[in-house]
């Protein structure tokens, strides 16, 4: 299991309740390597990263039964309610106009790779810079490609910055 994830919390419950042994890894990819080398019996990881690993490794499969479901969110300093409201408004707009669905479908499903997000021409970025923090090891949400952080989360963050007039760093 990847250290510090929801999967880690779930695996810890199993470890405490039925005596299972949980191996923790800094990256999901390290856990997958250990699985392929026969060092561990399974990997607990989110569905979409699991799907990405299975697509690259014919000898792996995803179990039919889900352990849990969860939702994701952006974190903003709780003292910055103005920015929180602006981001929420931008996300609502992006959901309503189909941008969020298009971003997700570019990474997940039958249309993967067919809808890359590109910023609209002429965006005024005079409102400053928003900084996104991530570990970029959680494909398709965020990962490195050609030494650049890419994925669903960076594309959504860029789309939010496009709506709000910020530079994304």
Write out the residue ranges for each language-model feature.
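Short loop->beta-strand "edge-of-pocket" segments that line small-molecule binding or catalytic clefts
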Residues: 1-6, 20, 129-134
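Extended ligand-binding regions for polar small-molecule ligands
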Residues: 3-6, 51, 73-113, 154-158, ...
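A ligand-binding cleft/hinge motif common to bilobed small-molecule-binding domains
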Residues: 9-13, 29, 34-68
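Helix-loop-beta element that forms the nucleotide-linked donor phosphate-binding surface
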Residues: 14-18
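Extracytoplasmic small-molecule ligand-binding "clamshell" domains
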Residues: 24, 86, 125-169
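Periplasmic-binding protein-like
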Residues: 47, 51-89, 111, 115-119, ...
């Amino acid at each position: 299991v990847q250290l510090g994830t929801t999967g880690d919390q779930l695996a810890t419950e199993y470890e405490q309740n039925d005596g299972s042994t949980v191996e923790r890894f800094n990256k999901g990819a390290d856990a997958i390597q250990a699985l392929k080398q026969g060092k561990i019996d399974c990997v607990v990881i989110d569905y979409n990263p699991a799907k990405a690993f299975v697509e690259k490794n014919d000898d792996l499969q995803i179990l039919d039964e889900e352990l849990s479901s969860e939702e994701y969110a952006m974190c903003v300093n709780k003292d910055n309610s103005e920015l929180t409201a602006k981001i929420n408004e931008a996300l609502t707009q992006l959901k309503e106009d189909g941008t969020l669905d298009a971003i997700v479908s570019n990474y997940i499903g039958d249309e993967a790779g067919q809808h890359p997000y590109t910023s609209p021409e002429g965006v005024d970025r005079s409102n400053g810079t928003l900084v996104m923090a991530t570990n970029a090891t959680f494909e398709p949400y965020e990962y490195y490609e050609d030494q650049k952080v890419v994925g669903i989360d960076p594309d959504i963050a860029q789309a939010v910055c496009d709506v709000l007039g910020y530079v994304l760093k």
